Amino acid sequence: MALTEIFFQASPALRVHAPSAHAAGNRHRDSGYGHQASQVNFWLPLAPAFGTNTLHVENLRGDGRALPLEGDFGVVHRFWGHELYHHTLPNDTPATRVSLDFRAVPGPHFDDTQAAFFEGGYYARARRAADGWAVVLPEGHTLLRGNQAG
């Protein structure tokens, strides 16, 4: 069966990980923050990601081994952030890493009873249309186009 609806994080996170003796975040699973159980995390480096300037993700749930997501800019990585631990390390490289990350949930698996991560707030909805995908706006919302953005 083809996917006809998807919920996606309405505002992707832009992250900057400069050289530092401190990690940019703590080791965590998104389940600890109440995220959707079926979400898929997407991580997109906008600069080369390597060594300690990259995101580290648990290889298999519960194995405790985190592997670095290394690669050139523009390579998208996906993982099950709800169940896999992920974190950064102190960046001891000379390079600043810039990245985008966002989450998506296949439509049939979206839990609309979750108060913290709901449609019209954290998530937006897209539906398959004849010519691709169309964003479905909640009542009262408008989509800015081109020069309308100010």
Q: Language model features by range: what are they?
A:
Residues 1-20, 25-28:
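Signature of the catalytic double-stranded beta-helix
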Residues 2, 47, 108:
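Hydrophobic/aromatic-lined pockets within catalytic cores
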Residues 3, 31, 89-91:
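Residues embedded in well-ordered secondary-structure elements
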Residues 12, 42, 100-104:
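A structural signal for short, well-ordered beta-strand segments
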Residues 22-83, 97:
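Catalytic core of non-heme Fe(II) oxygenases with the double-stranded beta-helix
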Residues 61-150:
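Catalytic core of Fe(II)/2-oxoglutarate
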